Every structure is written in C-alpha cells, then in structure tokens.
Amino acid sequence: MVLIRVLANLLILQLSYAQKSSELVIGGDECNINEHRFLVALYDYWSQSFLCGGTLINEEWVLTAKHCDRTHILIYVGVHDRSVQFDKEQRRFPKEKYFFDCSNNFTKWDKDIMLIRLNKPVSYSEHIAPLSLPSSPPIVGSVCRAMGWGQTTSPQETLPDVPHCANINLLDYEVCRTAHPQFRLPATSRTLCAGVLEGGIDTCNRDSGGPLICNGQFQGIVFWGPDPCAQPDKPGLYTKVFDHLDWIQSIIAGEKTVNCPP
C-alpha cells in the first residue's frame, strides 16, 4: 500500500519535486476502521475531488500539508469508505488557515505544513477522536505507521475507497540526501526521512497531509517522495511535527505573536 504522494507536478516553493498531495499507501493493507479515527479527508469544494489527508489534533484543529491548500476546501471527519455518502455532520470548512513563515534555521523544505481551524468543533465518537501532538522527538530506527487514501499502485493511478496503512522505517536524514542528490537537500533539515529501502512499500499520491505515527506519537506529515512511488533506495520526506510545536501551540492558544521555534 504505497501512500502515493501528490505527484501531480505541484511545484512547491519553486522546487521541482513530486509532492504527495494525494498519495496512497503502496504495499499496505486496508486500515482497521478503528485505527484512523483522527484521519480526515480534504476535498476541493468546486470539483468535489479528493485532495489529501489530514490529522485532527483536537475538536477544532486539523494539521496537514501546505501544498494541499486550495481556495475552497471541504474537510470530512469520521470517514472510512469514501464511496459511502457523507453525512452533513461530518463536513467542516476552514474558519482560519495558518502557514509556517518562520525563517530562523528553517529552509524552504521545512515549511510544508498548514494548520486549519474548523468552522465548528467536532463531537468525538466511536469513529472520531484526535491524535495528540508528540511529547518527544522521533527516534531514527523506529517503525512508523503511515496511512491514507492515496494511490495503491504507481505509476498507474489506483485510488482506493478505504484508507490503507503500512509500516515504514524512520531513517537518518542523510539517507534521503544521498538518495536524491538532484534536489540538493540542505545539510540540516526539520524534515524526517522515512521509507523501506527494499522498495515495494511507500506513501504515494493523495497520501499527502496524512500522519506518520512513530511509537504511538504523531511525528510526521506526508510531504514528498519520488515518482514512481515505492522505488528501492528512494525514501520520502515528512514534515517534522515536533520541530513545529511552538508555532502550533501558540496559534491554538490564540497568542497574538506566533512563536517561531529556535
């Protein structure tokens, strides 16, 4: 189940790389219906087309990837099978959208993150619950869980109705720098490198914005990966949630001055 990154040739920050805006999990399996209560689905309002995943972090806020942004977005909570008619109580709109503009020690590769305030709070239920922000940084070598409604085949596009889940490995960032020399990734970064070096398992197009969960903690946001997905020795990049905590928490707290991480 390859979480196929949004390889729709979206050029973010003037970088010519394939983003996982709508990636699926390749080499994975259908997620248990109770495994993804925090996973939300983002749709384009006008075309009604599925865009990305996102993560509910409390009853009023969703965290996703910046490149998933559109002028008009619909957000659905408590979704498993996208072919089933959504209930209007599952639908939300962005009340506010926040983008990461901090410049200190952050490169353009580190800013693919968007915080969305919903137009009204959601009610938790059997199929809706938040995923807490991380309390500690991720550990290289961890086995992480990725999930989404992204492509399950690549380069052919096969989009599933239900989310797929897969386990991938958290790798040293230098592995991604070596694997993708053409992009001249910075020597240090606030992004995570993750994948299965043997290939066959990956996130893919339309998985973008969804969570990477390591040791039970929300550590990454699906961001970028090679096209086709799931190639051997070609891991992907994930926005590192832990390094954006100050920014996230200051916005949610309603502080007038947003805190930029050191």
From Swiss-Prot:
<feature type="disulfide bond">
    <location>
        <begin position="176"/>
        <end position="193"/>
    </location>
</feature>
<dbReference type="GO" id="GO:0006508">
    <property type="term" value="P:proteolysis"/>
</dbReference>
<feature type="active site" description="Charge relay system">
    <location>
        <position position="208"/>
    </location>
</feature>
<dbReference type="InterPro" id="IPR001314">
    <property type="entry name" value="Peptidase_S1A"/>
</dbReference>
<dbReference type="GO" id="GO:0005576">
    <property type="term" value="C:extracellular region"/>
</dbReference>
<keyword id="KW-1204">Blood coagulation cascade activating toxin</keyword>
<dbReference type="InterPro" id="IPR043504">
    <property type="entry name" value="Peptidase_S1_PA_chymotrypsin"/>
</dbReference>
<keyword id="KW-0645">Protease</keyword>
<comment type="similarity">
    <text>Belongs to the peptidase S1 family. Snake venom subfamily.</text>
</comment>
<keyword id="KW-1199">Hemostasis impairing toxin</keyword>
<comment type="subunit">
    <text>Monomer.</text>
</comment>
<keyword id="KW-0378">Hydrolase</keyword>
<dbReference type="Pfam" id="PF00089">
    <property type="entry name" value="Trypsin"/>
</dbReference>
<keyword id="KW-0964">Secreted</keyword>
<feature type="disulfide bond">
    <location>
        <begin position="102"/>
        <end position="260"/>
    </location>
</feature>
<dbReference type="GO" id="GO:0090729">
    <property type="term" value="F:toxin activity"/>
</dbReference>
<dbReference type="GO" id="GO:0004252">
    <property type="term" value="F:serine-type endopeptidase activity"/>
</dbReference>
<feature type="disulfide bond">
    <location>
        <begin position="144"/>
        <end position="214"/>
    </location>
</feature>
<dbReference type="InterPro" id="IPR001254">
    <property type="entry name" value="Trypsin_dom"/>
</dbReference>
<feature type="domain" description="Peptidase S1">
    <location>
        <begin position="25"/>
        <end position="253"/>
    </location>
</feature>
<feature type="disulfide bond">
    <location>
        <begin position="52"/>
        <end position="68"/>
    </location>
</feature>
<feature type="propeptide">
    <location>
        <begin position="19"/>
        <end position="24"/>
    </location>
</feature>
<feature type="disulfide bond">
    <location>
        <begin position="204"/>
        <end position="229"/>
    </location>
</feature>
<protein>
    <recommendedName>
        <fullName>Thrombin-like enzyme crotalase</fullName>
        <ecNumber>3.4.21.74</ecNumber>
    </recommendedName>
</protein>
<feature type="signal peptide">
    <location>
        <begin position="1"/>
        <end position="18"/>
    </location>
</feature>
<keyword id="KW-0382">Hypotensive agent</keyword>
<dbReference type="GO" id="GO:0008217">
    <property type="term" value="P:regulation of blood pressure"/>
</dbReference>
<keyword id="KW-1015">Disulfide bond</keyword>
<keyword id="KW-0732">Signal</keyword>
<dbReference type="GO" id="GO:0030141">
    <property type="term" value="C:secretory granule"/>
</dbReference>
<feature type="active site" description="Charge relay system">
    <location>
        <position position="67"/>
    </location>
</feature>
<comment type="function">
    <text>Thrombin-like snake venom protein that release fibrinopeptide A from fibrinogen (FGA). Shows both kinin-releasing and coagulant activities.</text>
</comment>
<keyword id="KW-0720">Serine protease</keyword>
<keyword id="KW-0325">Glycoprotein</keyword>
<feature type="disulfide bond">
    <location>
        <begin position="31"/>
        <end position="165"/>
    </location>
</feature>
<feature type="glycosylation site" description="N-linked (GlcNAc...) asparagine">
    <location>
        <position position="105"/>
    </location>
</feature>
<dbReference type="InterPro" id="IPR009003">
    <property type="entry name" value="Peptidase_S1_PA"/>
</dbReference>
<keyword id="KW-0800">Toxin</keyword>
<feature type="active site" description="Charge relay system">
    <location>
        <position position="112"/>
    </location>
</feature>
